[in-house]
Amino acid sequence: MSKQTLVLLYGGRSAEREVSVLSAESVMRAVNYDKFLVKTYFITQMGQFIRTQQFSEKPSESERLMTNETIELTQKIKPSDIYEEGAVVFPVLHGPMGEDGSIQGFLEVLRMPYIGTNVMSSSIAMDKITTKRVLESIGIPQVAYTVYIDGQDLEACLVETLARLTFPIFVKPANMGSSVGISKAQTKVELRKAIQLALTYDSRVLIEQGVVAREIEVGLLGNDKVKSTLPGEVIKDVDFYDYQAKYVDNKITMAIPADVDQSIVTEMRSYAEVAFKALGGCGLSRCDFFLTQDGQVYLNELNTMPGFTQWSMYPLLWENMGLAYPDLIEELVTLAQEMFDQRESHLI
């Protein structure tokens, strides 16, 4: 039986490129090599496409994907050279230029099926401010927030924020993930510094009311028909779940399924599915919620390319539902092909 080519794109231009490499290495080990041939391409911080390894069988545990230190610049290619008829692309890319619609649009121009959400839903979900406004419009609860856009009057923004929110306040770049650039402010001075830090990552800044809450996550899978998982919980040993805690210090554990009332489970799964459809989602996403002590549910964000390592929440949520990691990858390939066929059928 001939194998289908699965193209892995990893690395990328955003500050989340290290997470991308971890996710891609997990995928390359989990793929069913009876069915797939895996070709990998590293995208440098400057946006260069480098042809890296090819796998026809499961690599050894010591095998690592090539990155900045090990790539061969002689293998630099034109981005369009990744094209291969019949191949499916898994853009295991996080953050700007990865899950913001940019690479998705490129792959649509190439006429290649790809795993994940489309251009529109990727770009909307990547921007935390736009996501909040869309979800508010359909009645999904959001924590109170204000917005600062680079070039506006910062002092006026501080006055407005302190009139509407109380400390602690969280400040986030609108277009970053993996908690990159997020700060917790307890004073006006810290708030100003937090906004200035966020501006180094994005020109749009979300300023959000801090809440004492559990962090609960729901996985989503599907195209026109979407399925959701039972929720899982992020158990924190730190003040908040930042990049260092997530990927460097390993100061988090997960409870899957989360220990929450059935009514809350039903509410979260419903909100997650409605949000996914409202943003035009397809393929996969992970919805992140806050659950307060009094039972209030807030949808914090919708992540269209969640961390995909074997220890990441998203694959583990589906494993808890009976869908093993290799089978999850196969299902995503099938969904990618379905969406490709649907897009092509509309081009008449």
Swiss-Prot record:
EC top class named in words: ligase
Transmembrane stretches, start-end: none
Location of the protein in the cell: Cytoplasm
UniProt keyword Metal-binding, yes or no: yes
Note on cofactor: Binds 2 magnesium or manganese ions per subunit.
Record key words, sorted: ATP-binding, Cell shape, Cell wall biogenesis/degradation, Cytoplasm, Ligase, Magnesium, Manganese, Metal-binding, Nucleotide-binding, Peptidoglycan synthesis
Catalytic reaction annotation: 2 D-alanine + ATP = D-alanyl-D-alanine + ADP + phosphate + H(+)
Keyword Cell cycle: no
Domain of life assignment: Bacteria
Binding site for Mg(2+) 2: E301, N303
Name the UniProt record assigns to this protein: D-alanine--D-alanine ligase
Organism: Streptococcus pyogenes serotype M5 (strain Manfredo)
